[in-house]
Amino acid sequence: MKDFLSISKERYTTKHYDSAKKIPENDVKDLLEVLRLAPSAVNIQPWHFFVGSTQKAKDLILPAIPDFNIPRIADCSHFVVLCSNTKLTDAQMSKITEVEVKDGRYPDHPEIKDTVDSHRKAFAHMHEQLGDFKEWTAKQAYIAMTALLYAAASKGIDSTPIEGMDFEKANEILNLKDKNLQSVMIVTLGYRKDDTNSLRPKSRLSYNDVIESLD
């Protein structure tokens, strides 16, 4: 496996996929596990991921995709619709704490779980009161998206993060409102085909343009 810096230098956003090439199932499982394990603020995990690979699944989501992005969906091996919560109940957040206890996060100090639980809920309620809860949870989905992109690249799998979509239509298709969810983006996955974008040198602003030391 390549080191992370090499992957960062080589990864690019794929424009065209080879529809004949499919991602091995074991690799798909690994990528979905990376999504599940992605970090989030106070471990709140305010997300849900819909995964598709069949023509039936693609046809389902295509009405939410504008013409210029349809080839990405049509020819990819798999796609993931990343969604974030628009609301989280106390019961949902308590479940997170229960899973943490079950996973052995507090073996020596079980009483900590109550403090962690109350702090997590307070943090979520703070964002509700600030009126930016939906934006906050969407930011967490972007963290998961980044993990997915680089995990895919580490396996030689190409990807495209897509914001060019009809979010309201996607919400309707997947019945997200009733699930207290909102669509945030789609990531397509597969293998490149005749993609001139892959031949262009990577271009970013210089180190000094974006990095500034406070030391």
Spans of model-derived segments:
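Acidic, surface-exposed loops and disordered segments
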Residues: 1-215
